[in-house]
Amino acid sequence: MVVHFAFLFHIYQPPVQIPVVIKQIVNESYTPIINSLHNHPEAKITLNINGTLTEQLHDFGYDELIEQIAILAAKGQIEFTGSGKFHPLLPLIPEPEIKRQIKLNNETNRHFFGRIYSPKGFFPPEMAISEEVLDTVKKSGFEWIIMSGIANILPEFPTTYISQDKNSLNLIFRDDYISIDCAFDKINNVDNFISRLYYKNTSEDYYVILAMDGETFGHHVKHAIKDFLIPLFDNVPNRNDVKICTISEIIEKFPKGPKQTPRASSWSTMPYDLAHDVPFPLWFDPQNEIHIEQHRFFMYALTLIHLAAKYRESMDQEKKDIFDNARNLLDRGIHSCQQWWASARPWYNTDMILRGLNEVLMASVNAKRSIPENVPDIKEAMELIMNDMLKAQNKIILSL
């Protein structure tokens, strides 16, 4: 009997992250992880890197790191996933915006990694899923999507078969217990990790999916690469009882099982959140006034952008440039971090809340500026929308 396990490392930094933090994380986490894979040819991971981080690595001079990731992907040691470029919480945005974020992510990562970037699987930011998100991911051409174990509604947790949704999208469920214990340094040596993998009393092969922020290794948990990851990569090739895989390799090995419609949730959703019908508590808690106003603010901004987009063809080049800047600012501004920092569960950071708010506000102002002079009625309508936007903004600022 063999336990097949796969690591999914999710690496991302918000587009408003400061350069000194990027540099620190590259040195503490990203580079050592990539080096450890190069030094262990039999080791492999599934990697989600959001396009905004790929761009940041390029902008800050880390092209060699991008190249090394691509080399490992070409060797089969890294399997890429798709995602939303700027890490929005997908269930909270309309389907056209979900499609746009997926498209932007594919274009950016393919530009930097080349044709080796051709993901079969999809990582929804924060593992936040809904039925609409699953439908959009399937229509976007992906074969599988990963989500938290709490999303599973079958009586049995899938470990010997691959569950699917109604559209035959393969559903991959994270083992939340082992993943969280790895992320919070409760599992920090090889023996402990292997013993946790062997939690089922069975004679048949099964699989375990571990997924966490890649920054866990070396940045959040300083010793995790030296004391856990490298020893694990040293140890696994010499064993017959466990096998390290990519997620797609696990899907190929195990048969298809029952279909289900997984529950809306994220990897931070707890049972008591679901009991109170709050599937995305760190980003849209009905009891959190900032979350409510942030969402209202975003929706007003989306309305302005979509309204301006209808007039793009009649804009002169200067106006088109202004609109394109507005569109890019909104793409960036709907990243999920600002809601996360407003959750106060337990994290709270007014600077990160305001940075995200500012990008959305700049997008809205530029959307209004882009409207041609010969359609004054539209400008007046946009001003009315912006008045309501500013009310939401004031509520956010006054509550900080």
What are these regions (language model features)?
Residues 3-94, 100-101, 120-124, 143-148:
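Short, well-structured secondary-structure segments
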Residues 155-199:
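Alpha-amylase-like alpha-glycosidases and glucanotransferases acting on alpha-linked glucans and related
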Residues 64-82, 106, 138-157, 161-173:
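Acidic, His- and aromatic-enriched active-site or binding-groove loops in soluble protein domains
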Residues 123-127, 147-149, 173-174, 211-213:
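Short His-Asn-centered micro-motif
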Residues 17-20, 56-61, 91-94, 129-138, ...:
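A short acidic (Asp/Glu
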Residues 97-126, 196-210:
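CE4/NodB-like, metal-dependent polysaccharide N-deacetylase domain
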